[in-house]
Amino acid sequence: SLTPEQLAEIEQLREQRSSTLRAVSEGMEGHIYTAYPVLDHGFVRVIDYMGDDAAICQAARVSYGKGTKSVQNDEGLIRYLMRHWHSTPFEMCEIKLHVKLPVFVARQWIRHRTANVNEYSARYSILDREFYIPAPEHVAAQSVVNNQGRGDILTGEEATRVLEILKADSARAYDNYENMISQDGQQGLARELARMNLPANIYTQW
């Protein structure tokens, strides 16, 4: 969830108005700075963007020339590019996001493709006591047909026990994290070392 300081910053930014010669996407303008809740403590919000449909088409017509001659309008050209897997023109547009998400989701997200990421640093700052705990309907067994996927939903005592373990382990790990970095009566462990004990379901931001 957003802090009061972040909410105040969002309101201040949304009140600002500026003129520009850049291409403006009306659809994207409606999302600027708005935080959309994700999972139990997470969110996604658009901070900035560059380009629109016209930027994609402009790049495609420069790159492919005669290959796009039969396509008369931008919508048709974009469909043509997607259908034939011409992906580079789409990279002429960028979206700058502010995301709060569990660490294990963050690692899975960016392992598939190189990205420009400026992540909240646990070397310099203290992480919040916020962990992703799945809703009961998302607690599932390992799939017997897909090694990367989930199977049937766990129910009854097993589901309750699993959730209690997840909550207890998260709380205990954070308690130990706080104790290690505390300078009350001790020097306190360096933050870059203390963070190694935190579980992958703790929330980060980028």
Please give the residue ranges for each predicted region.
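Family-specific signature for flavin-dependent thymidylate synthase
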Residues: 1-206
